[in-house]
Every structure is written in C-alpha cells, then in structure tokens.
C-alpha cells in the first residue's frame, strides 16, 4: 500500500454515512450532495477512501470522490466480515463497521476503483429496469391466465390487464432496442463472437457484455463463474461430507438464470456442452447438476472467445476441460 495515503473507512447507509479517520476518530455526514461536499472539505487530497459495496448507497459518494481525484476503493462486504472474524471481534455496530473498514484498508494492498463510463452506467440501468418490467410482464400474464380460470372473468378486469401488458411490452421493446444499440456501438465484435457460440442468442450475448463490462472485470473465467454463482460448494466437517455438492448461488442471479436457460439449447447444438452433459448423466449425475456444468462450460467458452478474439471452433472447444 502507498504509505503516503491516509485511509478513511466509510460505512454507508440510506440517510447517513460514518467515517473512521486514520487516527481512529469517528465522523458522520448526511448521505447527500451537501454531506459529500462537507466530507471532501474535511479530508486531505491524499485521502484513500475505502467503503463496502452496499447495493446503490455507496455509488453516489464513490463517483463524487472519484470525480474530484480522491483515491477510492470498494470492498466486498464478505471480505470485511471475514477480516472482523479473523480479529476475533464479537462486537459489531454501525460505527465500529467504519473502524473495521479503515483497519482493513490500512492492512491491505487495495485496488483503486474506477467508475463506469456514462454509456456503461446507462446500460446497467437499462438492464435493471428491463428485469423489473419483465417480471411485471410475467405477473400480468399469470394474472390474466388466473382470471380466465375463474370461468366467468370480468371483461373490465381482463381488458385493463391486457392494456397494461401491451403498454409494458412496448416499453420493454424500446429499452431492449436502446440497450442493443449501445452495446453494438462499442462492442460489435464481441457481440458477433458471442452469438457464434451455439446456445447463446443475442439477448444473452448483450447481457453478458453489459454485466461483465465486456469481460474486463475478471482476470480468469473462474472468477467470472464465481460471480455468476455457478461454482460448486462442498460442505464438510473433518473427513465427513455434509450433503451433496451444491452451487454457491451467491453471485449474480440474472447472469446465472440466463446461462441456465441457454444450457438447454447448448446441450443440443454445442459440441462441447453436449459431450459434457452426456458424460455426466452417463456417470449417474443428476440432469440439473449436468446443466449447471454446461453453464460453467458456456461461460468458459464465452470468456475465452471474447478475450482471445477468436471465433467459436467446435473442435477446439470440445477439448477444453
């Protein structure tokens, strides 16, 4: 770590955020533009601000500080939790969180956080809103089906639901078109390469590019698989294994669900994925576990192909272990 940096641990909540100074002092600011300005005035230019990734709450402050040339690092909350456990602390309050974040930052070589470009920020926002609208669309379809099962559905109710569904479908189409235009404007080559992988369609390819920032967020496909939550977790104690191996499910649920849907077509049309699926099923593995392995294989193919810039080759992919 740069010895010239002054570590400030920041614990952020919806309305306020607590700050632990390098000397261990505690400060509190409003989680607002005014609070950001007050904090920026209170710290030196060589301050290194360390905070946990807390959904949306940390982003505004992170961008504010980064835009003003302060060093910013964003840490996975699990790392802070493990750091606290390693130091045998049983007392955990909001203000002590800021202390532990500062201590963690002072003891680690931290990567500097770089904010996304404006286009990338829009792509992520479009992706999140699409997820909301698609979920609402599914709920409306289920509601319409439920009304028809009543035997004598109200025409007023059904008409209203259908109007809402049509309106939502139009919005989904607009957002998908905008997202596609954005991705094609910067990552057309990657999009073409991904669509060349049997089992991966255009929507999935676009989502992969957006969620992984064109596969630049990860140094290896293993890190990407962990992010997707499709790595196996084995629970064991001593020499005894407690239960079957399961996937972690701690990663990005959207990415995991997309891959799972793609795995069905991949088993039919992707040479390597089909061979893997058939081999695992022949060994007595469950079909679901085999499909998860196919998800892992698909993600490995996608990572390798985009990073290398080489198109899909069934003969090459079939020997990837």
Question: What do the predicted segments below correspond to?
Answer:
Residues 2-22, 101:
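Gly/Thr-rich phosphate-binding beta-strand-loop-beta motif of the actin/hexokinase/Hsp70
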Residues 24-48:
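Nucleic-acid-processing active sites and adjacent nucleic-acid-binding tracks
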Residues 29, 34, 208-283, 287, ...:
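Phosphate-backbone recognition surface of nucleic-acid-processing proteins
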Residues 47-57:
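Short glycine-rich phosphate-binding loop at a beta-alpha junction
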Residues 74-193:
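Long, charge-rich intrinsically disordered scaffolds of nucleic-acid metabolism proteins
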Residues 169-180, 184, 203-216, 257-263:
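Amphipathic, charged-and-aliphatic alpha-helical interface segments
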Residues 198-202, 224:
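Small-residue hinge/turn detector
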Residues 272-321:
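Acidic, carboxylate-rich catalytic segments that either coordinate divalent cations
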């Amino acid at each position: 770590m740069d010895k010239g940096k002054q570590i400030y641990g920041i614990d952020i909540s919806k309305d306020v955020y607590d700050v632990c100074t390098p000397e261990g002092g505690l400060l509190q600011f409003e989680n607002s533009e005014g609070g950001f300005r007050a904090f920026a005035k209170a710290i030196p230019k060589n301050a290194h601000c360390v905070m946990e990734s807390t959904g949306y709450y940390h982003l505004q402050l992170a961008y504010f500080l980064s835009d003003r040339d302060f060093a910013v690092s964003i840490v996975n909350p699990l790392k802070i939790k493990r750091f606290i456990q390693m130091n045998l602390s049983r007392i955990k309050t909001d203000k002590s969180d800021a202390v532990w974040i500062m201590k963690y930052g002072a003891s680690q070589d931290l990567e500097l956080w770089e904010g996304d470009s404006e286009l990338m920020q829009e792509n992520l926002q479009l992706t999140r809103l699409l997820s909301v609208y698609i979920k609402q669309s599914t709920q409306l379809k289920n509601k319409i089906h439920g009304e028809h099962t009543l035997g004598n559905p109200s025409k007023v109710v059904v008409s209203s639901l259908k109007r809402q569904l049509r309106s939502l479908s139009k919005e989904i189409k607009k957002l998908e078109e905008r997202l596609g235009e954005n991705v094609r404007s910067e990552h057309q080559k990657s999009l073409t390469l991904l669509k060349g992988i049997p089992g991966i369609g255009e929507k999935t390819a676009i989502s992969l590019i957006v969620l992984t920032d064109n596969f630049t967020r990860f140094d290896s496909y293993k890190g990407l698989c962990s992010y997707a939550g499709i790595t196996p977790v084995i629970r064991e104690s001593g020499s005894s294994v407690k239960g079957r191996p399961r996937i972690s499910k701690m990663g990005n649920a959207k990415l995991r669900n997309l891959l799972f849907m793609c795995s069905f077509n991949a088993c039919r049309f992707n040479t390597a994925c089909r061979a893997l699926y058939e081999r695992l099923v022949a060994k007595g593995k469950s079909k679901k576990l085999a499909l998860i392995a196919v998800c892992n294989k698909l993600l490995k193919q996608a990572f390798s192909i985009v990073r290398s810039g080489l198109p899909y080759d069934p003969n090459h992919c079939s020997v990837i272990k």
